[in-house]
Curated annotation (Swiss-Prot):
Domain of life according to the entry: Bacteria
Compartment list: Cytoplasm
Purpose of the protein: Catalyzes the attachment of serine to tRNA(Ser). Is also able to aminoacylate tRNA(Sec) with serine, to form the misacylated tRNA L-seryl-tRNA(Sec), which will be further converted into selenocysteinyl-tRNA(Sec).
Native organism taxonomy: Bacteria, Pseudomonadati, Pseudomonadota, Betaproteobacteria, Burkholderiales
Organism of provenance: Paraburkholderia phymatum (strain DSM 17167 / CIP 108236 / LMG 21445 / STM815) (Burkholderia phymatum)
Key words of the record: Aminoacyl-tRNA synthetase, ATP-binding, Cytoplasm, Ligase, Nucleotide-binding, Protein biosynthesis
The keyword Nucleotide-binding is assigned to this record: yes
InterPro entries given in the database record: aa-tRNA-synt_IIb (IPR002314), aa-tRNA-synth_II (IPR006195), aa-tRNA-synth_II/BPL/LPL (IPR045864), Ser-tRNA-ligase_type_1 (IPR002317), Ser-tRNA-synth_1_N (IPR015866), SerRS_1_N_sf (IPR042103), SerRS_core (IPR033729), tRNA-bd_arm (IPR010978)
GO BP, sorted A to Z: selenocysteine biosynthetic process; seryl-tRNA aminoacylation
UniProt cross-references to PANTHER family, sorted A to Z: SERINE--TRNA LIGASE (PTHR43697:SF1), SERYL-TRNA SYNTHETASE (PTHR43697)
PROSITE patterns registered for this protein in UniProt: AA_TRNA_LIGASE_II
Protein name: Serine--tRNA ligase
Residues annotated for ATP binding in this entry: R266, S267, E268, E353, I354, S355, S356
Amino acid sequence: MLDIQLLRKDIDGVAKRLADRGYILDVAAFSALEAERRAIQTRTEELQAKRNSLSKQIGAMKGRGEDTSAVMAEVGGIGDEMKASAVQLEDIQKRLSDLLLGVPNLAHESVPVGNDEAGNVEVRRWGTPRQFDFEIKDHVDVGTPLGLDFETGAKLSGARFTLLRGQIARLHRALAQFMIDTHTQQHGYTEVYTPYIVNPEILFGTGQLPKFADDMFRVEKGGGENTVTQYLISTSEISLTNTVRDSIVDSNELPIKLTAHSPCFRSEAGSYGRDTRGMIRQHQFDKVEMVQIVSPDTSYDALEQMVAHAEVILQKLELPYRVITLCTGDMGFSAAKTYDLEVWVPAQNTYREISSCSNTEAFQARRMQARFRNAQGKPELVHTLNGSGLAVGRTLVAVLENFQNADGSVTVPAALRPYLGGVDRLEVKASA
């Protein structure tokens, strides 16, 4: 959530910066609510001053033995009016809050201005895409003989679900373990096992609600008036970041660096017809997430560090990739700045997103009321960052395609072999 003081001080400037993100702020609605709020607050202050004055007058009158009933009745009337004003003010504050809940974060000044992904800027590349001397297969054709089972996944759960069997399932698990081990042993993150089902207010904290309810899977328990609504997490960023919700941490605890391996559940409501083949876009997929909770003066250094941590995974796996800075029109709702890492997918002859690392500055912290004590001992909002380290399913796709062999086997990247008991190749089992 944006700091409302920014809008009060420079509504036109904020509106312009939001327009760069493709969001049109309802300036008239905000200004009207603000005018109403100021009028009520001014009237309340006037009533308070008058009541204080009359209360002093009553004391003096009693000292002189005078009748105070008329003045006391007037004070009572003022009290009633103040109560009514308080109700009005609470309603206006809620309407202002509801308006702000739908407003995205402001982009950092270093973010390129653009309307969509065409405005993104490439930062660097690593690795050289392999030149194949045989016809490239996509991960579906490579993986199906090795244990990818789309047919059974669809039978069990419908479209965009996949069943993994045998050596493919083991490779998938190895990838996640390798990522977690790297982040905890080399990058200083603490591993966390989080709930996969969270309460609605948790999603308000990280920005998925109220704006993106259609992207979430909702679950209900109980029935009738006792129904309780909760949501499946779309990323463990949600649960990891909210661990500091409604709390004040000591500055010496920062940075807090957390990582988790979890399934993620997304309805893909806006992706109809996109990536319908294979594992690129699924309703359920695994991801290793990185979250950092830091002081404001270190958050952009932390963002660069987080990107480097995700890059280490790709480099250890020997997967070519590129890093891009997302433009204003392509960033996520909560982000102030985002880098995407895109891995080379040979069958598509292009790079595809495999990690997204974002600094949300104080946007999520304000919604969560997550603070730390600064050098002066005063509570101040933390900055929160999140990044994929990496999306496990898409990494599996990249390994299958980049390490495929002409005979249908897949060479196991050296970094993963210790997790597979030394196995260096996945091979198609001969039919009986």
